[in-house]
Amino acid sequence: PLLEKDNPSKLAMVFHSEHEFENGHLNYEYYYVFKYAKRFDYFITATDLQKEVLEQTLAKQGCQGIPIYSIPVGHLEELTESQGDRPPFSVITASRLDPRKRIDLAIRVVAQAQKRLPALQLDIYGKGGEADNLRHLIQELEAQDFIHLRGHADLKQIYPCYQAYLTTSQWETFGLTLMEAAGAGLALLGFDARYGNPTFIKEGENGFLVPYSETVPEEQLVKELADKLVQLFESDLAPFHQASYD
């Protein structure tokens, strides 16, 4: 038990979500963490990028000097190789079907890009309360033939059956599915938003990052992401796949 330890215990805080938004406002769920920051012995983030931002946030709060450690929340035991040719124009996304994941944007992106790439297909894996809304959006856009909700599945052997992974989440503290998709050699596409996307997506190497800001209209974000998706599939994908494995 904690109280029976011979040596004094250390108090740490693990940041599981964004702590400071683009507009400079702090995430309210961490209000008391920052109010009593000096009582903590150290903090833990999932990425080096969030560690850097947290250092800046603490400095603005007058709390410099508190150690911060970056510890990834997951890792890959091994890479997952494709057992054959990946189906052309195949895209996957996977997450909890929750409004914060913005799967609706992924649907709009693919629906727009499919007008220029008629063979494009998107499979959406995951379960959640947003499923009915997403199903209705797919019907509204008349995209039932090329966008499908696939439900929950063990994705390890599913990732290699696709050429590209699309994420439209507007912030991820890590991004486990991005890590898994990269480990299966997929080309990656998403917003240049903190923190997981720029950790795993290397611009022009294994995919594309689309500039993101909270002030940019969603219609523009969708168009720019659709343009990049088309550009990706008009490219030789082999170097992108190898860069993800690397």
How should these model regions be labeled?
Residues 187-191, 201:
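Short hydrophobic beta-strand element within catalytic cores of glycosyltransferases
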Residues 238-246:
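A short, well-ordered alpha-helix in the C-terminal region of glycosyltransferases
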Residues 170:
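Aromatic "clamp/platform" in nucleotide-sugar-dependent glycosyltransferases that forms part
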Residues 31, 38-66:
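A short, active-site helix/loop in glycosyltransferases that binds the activated sugar's phosphate group
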Residues 18-20, 49-50, 68-80, 129:
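Short beta-strand->alpha-helix junction loop in the catalytic core
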Residues 89, 93-115, 129-135:
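A conserved mid-protein helix/loop that constitutes part of the nucleotide-sugar donor-binding site
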Residues 135-152:
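Nucleotide-activated donor-binding/catalytic signature segment of Leloir-type glycosyltransferases, i.e.
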